[in-house]
């Protein structure tokens, strides 16, 4: 079928994707919905803002409620953070951020849709209307459930067995998880009709483009992460002192911004671990006495991954898919103009609402 990208339809798709991101991961939700969203808006002239807000909400902020949502939270889960801890502790942060962004998006999209009169005539719509909307390839929901199951398995099952692979210890449960994920992907490829992928404009080109970029990013950020891990004894000692008071007590709002800003331009998963350990690394203490600090670290690493294309892998994947469909997306700094103008004021508001008054000494921002 063919959805028509009105403000209500677009906002509904973004809202659904935001919810799905914590269930099937930001990458899964983004890849599931980006092509239908692009097709729904293929008869509109102004649609870059639609993809930008899609990155904000579906590829980032929506994944903040469970370890399935985003890699930083999954690493926390592997460290022993309870599965529903993030949902319990940053639920309000996520809802406030999502509702505000959806409202801002609806206002911007309504302006373009109603005042700019930029919708093309229906006869020029590249996607023709059909009698009904529906799903093809529904068997893939089974393989998706299997993939989620393997991810959860690696966090819940502690085999106690490790293998040394090229000098890196790899736990048995992680090997089982990775083999399971590859198997689910293979079954999906084999059981899905080629016509479904053709009709969905599926291509490996965006995946390869993102893979090349992130291999380079992971190699180049390794020294930076190592310097951060050195803590007070490394070149970032000033940052360590910045996020604690004179008595060594964590300052939540500073953890939120330090974790977030670095996550926006480095890989957010190792950045989360750096600040997790910087805050003490004691799961029992971080999930109770220092719960507000861990909430700040969790929210910062997930939310601020939206600040740049390289803050989170789905960001660049969405950009690549959009460009592959023919949409001219903003440059790296062009996207940052959008993200900083919209997200920084939002994050300042979240700081005041959720992090400024949690600090033990009641320091006011």
Regions found by a protein language model. Give the residues of each.
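C-terminal ends of transmembrane helices
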Residues: 1-3, 38-41, 108-111, 187-202
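Alpha-helical transmembrane segments and their helix-start/interface "positive-inside/aromatic belt" motifs
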Residues: 10, 53, 131-143, 201-215, ...
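Small-residue-rich segments of transmembrane alpha-helices in multi-pass membrane proteins
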Residues: 12-19, 55-63, 123-130, 207-221, ...
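Membrane-interfacial helix-loop connectors
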Residues: 21, 31-46, 50-52, 58, ...
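Structural signature of hydrophobic alpha-helical transmembrane segments
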Residues: 21-22, 26-29, 90-99, 173-184, ...
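Juxtamembrane and boundary regions of transmembrane helices in multi-pass small-molecule transporters
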Residues: 65-66, 75, 84-129, 303-365
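Long, contiguous bundles of hydrophobic transmembrane helices that form the permeation core
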Residues: 101-163
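Transmembrane helical segments that form the transport core of multi-pass membrane transport proteins
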Residues: 143-274
């Amino acid at each position: 079928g063919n959805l028509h990208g009105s403000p209500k339809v677009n906002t509904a798709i973004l809202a659904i994707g935001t919810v799905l991101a914590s269930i099937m991961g930001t990458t899964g939700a983004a890849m599931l919905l980006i092509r239908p969203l692009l097709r729904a808006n293929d008869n509109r002239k102004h649609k870059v803002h639609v993809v930008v807000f899609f990155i904000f909400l579906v590829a980032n902020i929506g994944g903040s409620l469970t370890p399935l949502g985003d890699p930083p939270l999954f690493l926390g889960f592997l460290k022993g953070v309870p599965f529903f801890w993030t949902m319990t502790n940053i639920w309000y942060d996520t809802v406030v951020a999502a509702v505000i962004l959806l409202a801002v998006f609806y206002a911007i999209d309504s302006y373009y849709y109603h005042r700019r009169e930029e919708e093309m005539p229906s006869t020029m719509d590249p996607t023709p209307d059909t009698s009904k909307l529906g799903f093809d390839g529904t068997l893939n929901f089974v393989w998706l459930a299997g993939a989620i199951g393997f991810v959860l398995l690696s966090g819940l099952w502690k085999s106690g067995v490790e293998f040394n692979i090229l000098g890196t210890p790899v736990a048995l449960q992680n090997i089982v998880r990775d083999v399971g994920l590859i198997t689910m992907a293979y079954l999906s490829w084999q059981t899905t009709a080629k016509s479904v992928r053709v009709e969905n404009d599926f291509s490996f080109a965006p995946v390869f483009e993102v893979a090349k970029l992130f291999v380079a990013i992971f190699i180049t950020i390794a020294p930076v992460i190592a310097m951060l891990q050195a803590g007070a004894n490394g070149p970032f000692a000033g940052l360590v002192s910045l996020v604690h008071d004179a008595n060594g007590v964590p300052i939540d709002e500073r953890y939120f911004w330090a974790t977030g800003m670095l996550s926006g331009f480095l890989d957010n998963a190792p950045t989360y671990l750096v600040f997790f350990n910087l805050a003490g690394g004691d799961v029992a203490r971080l999930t109770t006495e220092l719960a507000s600090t861990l909430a700040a670290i969790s929210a910062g690493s997930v939310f601020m991954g939206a600040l740049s294309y390289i803050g989170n892998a789905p960001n660049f994947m969405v950009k690549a898919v959009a460009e592959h469909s023919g949409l001219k997306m903003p440059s790296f700094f062009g996207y940052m103009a959008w993200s900083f103008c919209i997200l920084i004021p939002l994050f300042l508001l979240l700081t005041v609402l959720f992090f400024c008054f949690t600090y033990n000494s009641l320091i006011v921002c």
